[in-house]
Amino acid sequence: MLSALLVMAAIAVVLGAALGFAAIRFRVEGDPLVDKIDAILPQTQCGQCGYPGCKPYAQAIAQGEADINQCPPGGEEGVRKLADLLGREFKPLSAEHGEEKPKAVAYIDENVCIGCTLCLQACPVDAIVGAAKQMHTVVDPLCTGCELCVAPCPVDCIYMEPVRETVQTWRWKYPVVEIRKAA
């Protein structure tokens, strides 16, 4: 019994070391510009920009295939930060991709929900929990407010509630000029 346990532990150590070596040896380097652009985007994964998520949109911006003003959840502040990062001229938010709205979170009226799971399938960040023919609910901290769960609901039990500003959620609304150290 003890020898079998030692053999299993040795196998686990060898496989762990092999995986660690492979992760270092075969690392795929990403484009640092794409990572910087992606860090500025709001990570709502809403698709309002015409791309399936924030990372593909960041790649398109870096490759020059998309404009910097297509992200309504990022708002004017996001466009300003992207313009500063890329050295481009600021453009107002594109109206064809939507308008900037205050941050909102989805809520499900649990008395009306029929448990069809359509909202579960539509949520890009898995912020909705529930099972078939069971009540569903939204995990507030995970919800990005993308509104993709609202349209598929057959009984209209999902509504968007604006997030009230608290000490934890308040953000400075005005452009911030970064002060750089003199060389």
Swiss-Prot record:
**Would you name any one GO CC term?**
plasma membrane
Which Pfam families does the record associate with it? Fer4_21, FeS
Keyword Iron-sulfur, does the record have it?
yes
Which Enzyme Commission numbers does its entry carry?
7.-.-.-
Keyword set for this entry?
A: 4Fe-4S, Cell inner membrane, Cell membrane, Electron transport, Iron, Iron-sulfur, Membrane, Metal-binding, Repeat, Translocase, Transport
Q: Where are the transmembrane segments?
A: none
Q: Where in the cell is it found?
A: Cell inner membrane
The cofactor named in the record is: [4Fe-4S] cluster
Per the entry, what this protein does is:
Part of a membrane-bound complex that couples electron transfer with translocation of ions across the membrane.
What family is this protein classified in? Answer: Belongs to the 4Fe4S bacterial-type ferredoxin family. RnfB subfamily.
Q: What is this protein called?
A: Ion-translocating oxidoreductase complex subunit B
- Supply the gene name: rnfB
